[in-house]
Structures are given as structure tokens and as C-alpha cells.
Amino acid sequence: MAPPPFRPENAIKRADELISVGEKQAALQSLHDFITARRIRWATPSTVEPVVFKFLEIGVELKKGKLLKDGLHQYKKLIQGSTEGLVSVGAVARKFIDLVESKIASEQTRADELQKQEIDDDLEGGVTPENLLISVYESDQSVAGFNDEAITSWLRFTWESYRAVLDLLRNNALLEITYSGVVKKTMHFCLKYQRKNEFKRLAEMLRQHLDAANYQQSKSGNNLVDLSDADTLQRYLDQRFQQVDVSVKLELWHEAYRSIEDVFHLMKISKRAPKPSTLANYYENLVKVFFVSGDPLLHTTAWKKFYKLYSTNPRATEEEFKTYSSTIFLSAISTQLDEIPSIGYDPHLRMYRLLNLDAKPTRKEMLQSIIEDESIYGKVDEELKELYDIIEVNFDVDTVKQQLENLLVKLSSKTYFSQYIAPLRDVIMRRVFVAASQKFTTVSQSELYKLATLPAPLDLSAWDIEKSLLQAAVEDYVSITIDHESAKVTFAKDPFDIFASTASKEVSEEENTEPEVQEEKEETDEALGPQETEDGEEKEEESDPVIIRNSYIHNKLLELSNVLHDVDSFNNASYMEKVRIARETLIKKNKDDLEKISKIVDERVKRSQEQKQKHMEHAALHAEQDAEVRQQRILEEKAAIEAKLEEEAHRRLIEKKKREFEAIKEREITKMITEVNAKGHVYIDPNEAKSLDLDTIKQVIIAEVSKNKSELESRMEYAMKKLDHTERALRKVELPLLQKEVDKLQETDTANYEAMKKKIVDAAKAEYEARMADRKNLVMVYDDYLKFKEHVSGTKESELAAIRNQKKAELEAAKKARIEEVRKRRYEEAIARRKEEIANAERQKRAQELAEATRKQREIEEAAAKKSTPYSFRAGNREPPSTPSTLPKATVSPDKAKLDMIAQKQREMEEAIEQRLAGRTAGGSSPATPATPATPATPTPSSGPKKMTMAEKLRAKRLAKGGR
């Protein structure tokens, strides 16, 4: 049996019918069943799309995210075998996103309107205790400004829809463009509604999709994403650029940094350079990220790259160039001092690679590169150039405050200056402290803080100035000693002096405490005695390596100090210069030591590999002998292990049996005690019963039960006697009281009965009197009522009679019209039947006449044929002589004349029939008068026989053949 025809419009019609009766859920389920059926695999996707669109519309309206996701995935699974199917999947995904976005927009508009109305209604605003109590039991949860659950649920549904569509479209070459569009819309959604957590999940999801696409490059399959394609890679790169932009706008700095790494890796493998405008926007976002991260060098580098790209913008103005150039130069000036080299791993080194920098640039190099670049330095504000001269070129700690006082007033009016106030203040403060350490050896705190107090907006409190001073000391730009009693600050001139004195004290203390520690260790070892291992051997005493770190550092610094003090440039330098020289020397020395260690390690590895090679060669030569020895040792060890395991298993079995017996015994005792205690006759303490066996417990129970039974019997006998006397006394006392109560109840019932009876009688009397009053009133107006009734009846009767006569006349007229209509219709039908009968009769007569004419013509032709053939040859057996092809003229002409005559008669008969029919039709209005037949026209003798037309000749020939 063939399957029913595939009609998607029926599914839509069925869904509309269910929606019309309020069954939207059933309509959604019916559409889901239709689009997930296997039969649509062989259908044209364009015919199924309207059903899917209807399914999406209802699903979005009902917020059935899981059902929608399942339906879309099943639909893709069924039709993804063809290109048209994947195109349909893309169209369906776009429709789904459009529906969701329009719905969330309408819900947001409605929520804004409701909120506006609530604000207008409730002038007090906010959340009150009354509103909180009302919100507990109100279904709409619409307390003014308190609960936004409706819009939140739609936001959650929108986010889940975006996720479902991205999962539907991912890693398919034919759906890349749609996938890219949905990604951009999802990021716009997160930005518009400030969905930070959702944006983090989106970024992680996109990374997983890219990882999956990268993994599939080595696989084979249909419609796989080709990352070697320039357009595909550019789309992924544009997504990451937008991801960085949205991360910065949402202030998700960690996510922005991860997105920057994604962009860096994609740009490395991309063969096509991004657009300058896109790169400029990207570097502008990097500027913000690196400013927040606290790395001014990266911040300035990103500014320079942005400016280089922005300078190619034809729409850029000179004012913008001036602002950006000044900002770049100010950011470079605000970079922290890095004159002392850092020791150890720089955590920001990885970030420099993101800007294609081979090494970390110094502050001095950055400033020098900006000054040498005329396209930047030539457009810098003069105030910043003056600031650079004050801080970097001609810095004087005594005059810096006066120089900055007028300059900062001008700079404060600049829009770009406010964000660099804090880093610029740190740079100037660091310069002030370094200059003060060179100028003073000991200075009062008030004088130093006065010297470090800068004009507004760079001013700080005394506490913040002290924090900056301590930070400078931590970073080794100065070395200070603060005496709070005398309020003095002492600056060290040599970094080795303070540390050497401190280290010597610590070393002496450690030397004094070392013997005591050694004695305590020896006493502890004697008390514990020699320790043994599991095999019974005495463990050799291992000496713990004790490294006195302070002493080690002290010795190393002494060596470094001896080396550096022999250098004239070190002795004549300031504290900061000495620290810089010492660190550079240490870095160089450590680098040399590391190179030596690396060489030693390489040599050791080489020797180890050579020894390993020799050992392998030796093992190969003695492999057979070693194998026998090893096999014998393995067998012995295996036998010993098996014996030990067997013994251990036997011991464990015995212990297991004992434990099981004890457990059963304990369980039985516990069960017995529980049952006895549950009955309540005897109570046995479970803790005390642990030391008793089962028989002893039974004897205790029997003794306790016997004792309790005798006590119970005696108490019962006493209680029965007491109860008998008490019951008798109670009955004697309560008998008069019960009689009084019965009498009282009878009196009360009698009084209630009389009151009820009186109430009923009074009500009946009142009702009777009221009805009698009504009757009296009605009797008074009864005559008037009858007169009015007769008057109204007479008036209405005449009106009704007139209406009846009118309706009767109308009915008669309608009947006559109907009769005339029926008669006319029947007359016309009779005329039509009569015409049909006449036409049939004429056709029959005409057919008979034609048959008669045909017969006569056939007879004439036969007679003519007989005359043309000689008699002798017809009767004989010989063949007739050959006849010439053309007969003589005298022989042919009679036959032709006969044929012309027959045709003439036939024409006359046809004309007569037509005239008769025409006459009857014209006289149809008077059927009683018969139509006069038309007299056929007699041909004129002089005119001769009329020639036959070609059609008449052919018709005559057909009739002749039919007659034969």
C-alpha cells in the first residue's frame, strides 16, 4: 500500500485549528512530530520550511527552548545530506534568531512601559515592607521596581536560543556565514543587556568550536571548515576582534586578555592582513586593557601602534592627531622608572609578544623613539614638552614645585591628563626621593614630606607620601631608616653597608645558637635509639643538609662588594647607580654561572648516555645467563610469596570465622535485649549486658519477669478494691445533681418552645394582615382595571385586523406572482421540449431522405456500370479487351448530369428543412398556428444545372461508398 501524500500545508492547518481552540502546546507538539518524522528526509526542504517557521513561532511564544532545540537538531539531521538541506537549515536558524530578537524587544518595551506606569503611580518608589509582603502571594510579582522576573526569563530564553543556534551551525563550511552572523548578534545581545557571565560562556564556546575545527583539519568528511581558506580565517578573526571590543566595553579584562591571545594566534596563521580600521579599533582596545593591567610600557606601545594606523585615516583632523600625540607622549612620561634592572622572570614578557616585540623596551628607549618620531613629537602640546624637560632633562628637587605649579593648571584643562595623574605623580615622587637621598644623609620627616608635597592635583597626604617612600625603598631606589621618635629619615649611601651590618649580627646569633641546636639533636637521637627498617636492618643515620641562608647571602654579597669597590665608577656613584651596577653585575655573573652549569649538565648527560650505551651492550652479551638467573630468582620469590599468601589466607579465614561467630552472638543478645525492653516488663541495660552470655541474660530476664508478675498481681488486687468503693461513692453523690440538671433542662426547653410558638404566630398574623391590605387595595381598582383592559383590547384588535388584512393581501399577491412564475417556467420548458422534439423529427426525416438519396444514387451508378460493359464479355469467361483510359465524351456526360441533378435535389431538401425550422422558431410564441413549410425554389430552365462545390462532391462520394 502506497504511503499517504506528503502535504505540509495540512500540518500547518492542523496547528492553526488547535491554536484556535486554545491548545497551543498540542499544536507545537504536532509540528514537532511532523518535522522530526523520517519521511521529510525525502521531501524538498523548501516545502517543509513553512512548517518549521510555524513551529518556531509557536515555540518562541511559549518559551519551549528544549523542544525547539531538539526539533532543530532533528530537522538538521534529516535534511543535511544535500546542499539545499543545509541552506534550509541556515534559513531556519536566521528565522529563529529574528523571532527571538523581536520577542525580547517587544517584552523589553512592554516592561519599560509597565515600569514607567508604576513610577507614575507610586511616587514614593522603592520597595516597602507592604510591597514585599504582597509579592509573596501575588502571581505577577510586579512590586514596583522590585522583581523583574518576566524580562529575566526572556533574557535567559534568548541566551539559550543563541547557544542552541550556534551549536546547530558550528563547524560546517556551508553555514559559516550564518554562524558568523549569529555570533555577532549574540555578542551584541550580551553587550546590550550587560550579560557578563553569558559573554564569558560565549567566548569559551567559541574557543571550543575553533579547537574542534582545528582538530578536524586532519580528518575527512563533508562540509568541514577549512582554516587554510583566507575568507574563513578572516571571519574567525573578525569574530575575535569583536570579542575583544565587547570584552572591553563590559570591563571583562581577563576575558579581553584571553581574546587578545586568540587574535594573536589567528593573525599569525592568517595570510590576509586585517583592515586598518579594524586594527586601529583593536589597538585602541589594547590601550584600555594594558592601562587597567598596570603596564604603562605596553600601554604606550599600543598607543603608538594605534596612532600609526589612525594616521592613514583620511577623515582624521589635525586636532585629533594633536590629542593622540599628546596622550602617547604623556603615557610615556608617566611610565614607572625602570633604571634599576629587575631580577627574575618578568610575568609581562608574554604580553610583549602579543605586540610583536622581541624584548621588553625600556622607558628611556620608549621616550627616545617618540622624540625621534617627528609625526608624533611634532604634534605634542608645548606644555607636555615643558613637563618632559622638567622631569627628565633638568630635574631639580628644589624648584620642581614652582615649575609644576603653573604648568599643572594648563595641563588640568586637557581632557587626556586626568587618567595619568596617579602614574605621573608616582614618577615625580620617585624622582624627588632619589634626589633627596643624594642631597641629604639625615633629614627630618616634615622637611622631606614638605619637599615631596606637589601642587594639586598631584598632592598627597603625609601618610601616602610615607607609603610612596617605603615603596621606593622596597624597589631599591633608596635605602632608608626611619626613626619615629626623633622624626628623622636617614638615607644610606652604599647598599652593602646596612646589609653587611645586619647580616653580621644574624650570623653571630646563628653561630651562638648552633651548638645548642646540635646538642638537642644528639640528645633526641640517643633517646630514640637506632631506627630499623621493615627488613630489620638498622637505618643509616642521614645527615640533613643545613644551609645557613643568611650566611650564604652574606658571603656572596661580601664577594660582590669586594669586586665592586675596586671599580672607580661604583665608588663615585649614587645609591641608585650602585644598586644598578650591582644588579647588572649579579645578572651577568648568574648568566655566566648558568652557562657553566648548562655545559656541565650537557657533559653529564653525554656521559650518562655513553654509560647507558655500554651497559646495554654488556647486557646484550650476557642476556641469556642473566635471564636464567633472573628466572630462577623469580620462581623462588614466587614460591615464597605463594606460601606466605597461603599462610596469611588461612590465618585470615580463622579470624573471619571468629569475628562472624562473635557478631552472630552479639546480634542475638542485642535482639533479645531489644525485644525484652520493647515489651516493657523488664529493662536490661545494653552496656551492662555486653559482658554477659546468652544463658545468664535469660536467667536475669526470668527472675525479673517473676518478680514483676507478683508485684503486678498485688497492685491489681488493691486497685480493684479501691476502684469499687470509689465508684459507689461517686454514684451516690452525683444522683441528686443529675436530677437537678434534668429539671433545669426541661424548664429551659419549655421556655424555648413557648417563645418559638409565639414568634411563629405573630409572624403569621402579620403576614395575613399584610395580604388582606393588599386585597383591599386591589378590589378598589378592579373596575378601573376592567375598563382599561376593554379599551386597550378594542384598540389593539382594530390594529391587528388591519395588519392581518394587509398581510393577507401581500400573501395573495405573492401567491399569484409565484403561480405566474411557475406557469411561465413550465410554458418555457414545454416550448423547449417541443423544439427538441421537432428538431429530432427533422433530423430523423433528413437522415431518411439522405439514405433514400444515397440508395437512388447507388442504383443509378450500378445501372450506368451495367450499360458500359458489353453483354458478351459479362457472360463469357474471356477477358474483355483493353479499354482506353479515357472514355469518349458522349459516354461520360450522361453520368455527370445525373450526379449534378442528385446534388441539386439534396441542396433543395436541406434548404427546405432549414426554412421549416426557421419558420417554426419564429412562430414559437403562437404554438397553435403551425408553421408553413417553405416551397423549394424551382430552378430556371435557362440557368441549367448548378455546379457542385468541392465539399458537395466529397460528401456525395462518401455516401456512394457507404451505399456499396
Curated annotation (Swiss-Prot):
Residues 321-496 form the PCI domain. Residues 839-865, 895-914 have a biased composition (Basic and acidic residues). Residues 923-945 have a biased composition (Low complexity). One of its GO terms (cellular component) is cytoplasm. Residues 503-545, 839-964 are annotated as: Disordered. PROSITE patterns: PCI (PS50250). Residues 955-964 have a biased composition (Basic residues). One of its GO terms (molecular function) is mRNA binding. The modification Phosphoserine is found at residues 508, 691. Its main location: cytoplasm. Residues 508-544 have a biased composition (Acidic residues). Keywords: Coiled coil, Cytoplasm, Initiation factor, Phosphoprotein, Protein biosynthesis, RNA-binding. Residues 625-668, 702-734, 796-869 form a coiled coil. It comes from the Eukaryota. SMART domains: PINT. RNA-binding component of the eukaryotic translation initiation factor 3 (eIF-3) complex, which is involved in protein synthesis of a specialized repertoire of mRNAs and, together with other initiation factors, stimulates binding of mRNA and methionyl-tRNAi to the 40S ribosome. The eIF-3 complex specifically targets and initiates translation of a subset of mRNAs involved in cell proliferation. Present with 52700 molecules/cell in log phase SD medium. Belongs to the eIF-3 subunit A family. The eukaryotic translation initiation factor 3 (eIF-3) core complex is composed of TIF32, PRT1, NIP1, TIF34 and TIF35. A subcomplex of TIF32, NIP1 and PRT1 mediates the interaction with eIF-1, TIF5/eIF-5 and HCR1. The factors eIF-1, eIF-2, eIF-3, TIF5/eIF-5 and methionyl-tRNAi form a multifactor complex (MFC) that may bind to the 40S ribosome. TIF32, NIP1 and TIF-5/eIF-5 comprise a minimal 40S-ribosome-binding unit. TIF32 interacts with 18S ribosomal RNA and RPS0A. This is Eukaryotic translation initiation factor 3 subunit A. It comes from Saccharomyces cerevisiae (strain ATCC 204508 / S288c).
